[in-house]
Amino acid sequence: MEVTVLEVAPRDGLQNERAIVATADKIRLIERSVEAGLRRIEAVSFVNPQRVPQMADAEAVMAGVPRVPGVSYAGLVFNDRGLDRALATDVDEINVVVVATDTFSRRNQNCTTAEGVQRWSALARRAAASGVRRTVTIAAAFGCPFEGEVSAAAVLDLVRRVAAAEPDEIALADTIGVGTPDRVRTLVAGTAALVPGVPVRCHFHNTRNTGYANAVAALEAGAGILDASTGGVGGCPFAPAATGNIATEDLLYLLHRMDIGTGVRAEAVSATGTWLGEVLGSPVPALLGRAGGFPPARPGSQ
C-alpha cells in the first residue's frame, strides 16, 4: 500500500506563528521537505496579508522554491484576487476552502457556506481554464467551534455540491481536532461513494490526541492522501484552540511501521522538525525527534 503525504507546515504550520518567519527560512523549510522525499507541499496562501501577516511574502517564497520534477506546490486561495496572485507565481495547484457551517464560514471567509460553494465553483472554473490543478477542502467537517456537531448528512450534501465544479481532489478537514475514527470512516467512505474516481484527502489535528487514529481510519476507508505538518506545528487562526496538526515525522513512523509506503525519509523530516523548532524559538510538538525511531539504527549502519 502506498500513501501520499502532503506537507502543510510552510502554510498551515506557520500561519499562526506570531513572530514573522524569514522568507529564507520558509524556503529552506520547503527545500528540506523536498530533500526528504515529500512531493506535494502546501507552500503558501494568497490571502489578505492584514488578516494573515505570516503569508504576506507568498510571491517571494514561490519565487525561491526548488523546481524539481514530480514536486507539486499548492497555494491556498479564497477569492479572485488570491487566484490572480497564485497564477502569477506558476503555482502547480490551488486549494480552496469551503466551511461546513455558516457561523465559522463568516468568521473565516466573511461569507455563508452557500456563498463559499459559489466562490469555489467560480475559482475552479478559472483555474481549470488556466491549466492549474484545483482541490477543495471542506473545513469543520467533523465539528464546528461555534455551532458544535455537524451531521454527516450535512457534510456529504456539501461534498455533492462542491463536486459539481469537478475538483481534482476533495479533502475533509478536522479543523478543531474533534473527529473520531468511526466518524472518519463514515465521511471518507461516503465521500468516495459520492465522487467515484476523485481522490479523497484528509486533514487532521491532534488537538485531543485522536489525529493519528483518525489517519489510520481514513486510509482504511479509502483515503489515499493525508495532510501533515513537520514538527506538528500549526492551526487555524480563526478557530479557537485549533492547535496541533498531526506531525509529518510521527505520521511517517506510524505508516512505515505498518508497512505502508510513502517515499519519504522519516528521519530527515524529524531532523527538519528539530531545526524548525530552533527557527521558531521553541521545541515542536512532534515526538519522533525526542524518542527516536525503532528499531534504533546500529552504529555504522546505513
Predicted regions: what they are:
Residues 1-302:
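Catalytic cores and adjacent flexible loops of soluble metabolic enzymes
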